[in-house]
């Protein structure tokens, strides 16, 4: 059984323009985003199917790395995705990994 990891290195943290704009005008939303990032880093990927959750765990334990995803809702039920591309891909160098906070419609 693979255990839920703590994710120490998620690369560069990016926000889409939509999320960034909303954070600038809505303090509660910005606070929620900070809290959701903490959940994500702690290996709590929110509202994912069991298959997607397991895929995240496998990617964390796979030496080839992979992609991680979390799906959440903010205080007003706005859906947020957090996606890490290139997690643990040491063969591509440390600058390859990045984590993006976005609205699903921005994907």
Explain the meaning of each model-derived region.
Residues 1-69:
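Compact soluble domain cores
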Residues 59-107:
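Short, compact, well-ordered microdomains
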